Structure formats: C-alpha cells, structure tokens
Amino acid sequence: MTVFAIEYHYPADSPQIIELRPAHPEFLGKLKEEGKLIGSGPYTDGDGDALIVIQLDDSATIADAEALMADDPFHTNNALTGRVFHTWNPVLNIFGV
C-alpha cells in the first residue's frame, strides 16, 4: 500500500469550516469504510489545520490521492486555504498498515 499524509490548512475560527464540519466526517467515514482512511484530526495548537492519512494501492500516485479527496466538502466548498499531499513512509509503523 502507498500511504499519503495530507495537510489541510484553514483558520481555526473559520465560520465556513465550522458550518461544514458535520459533512466532513461523513466523507471521511466513507473512506474508513472502504479501508482507505488510516487516521485524521485537527492539530490542537490553536492555529487551525489538520492532518489526514490515507492508504491506496501500491501503484497510487499523489494525483490519485488528490482525486480521492476531491469530493471532501471542505475542498468542494473552497473552505481550505490550502492542501498539501505527501507520500509517506511510516517507518515505525504503529498504524497496522
């Protein structure tokens, strides 16, 4: 499997993020059911932003990860100030992937 770490950037006090928050976990829940979501959550330092970690097939590329995340309500409603996709190698793999 190829693992991707995705950074979501947004202001902590964004009214749009707050409004869309119920729809975002629903989207992530579908990824979890499909076995693609490893974990996700906001950073707790008060600056906003979040990390999402997903797994796709060995041949998957960043473009594949971007396509998978394209329907996230945070993205489709332009609530994010940025998204950064990385391939990631969990060397000390405590995630079971």
Task: Please report, for each region that a protein language model flagged, where it lies by residue.
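Conserved, structured core segments of small domains
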Residues: 1-97
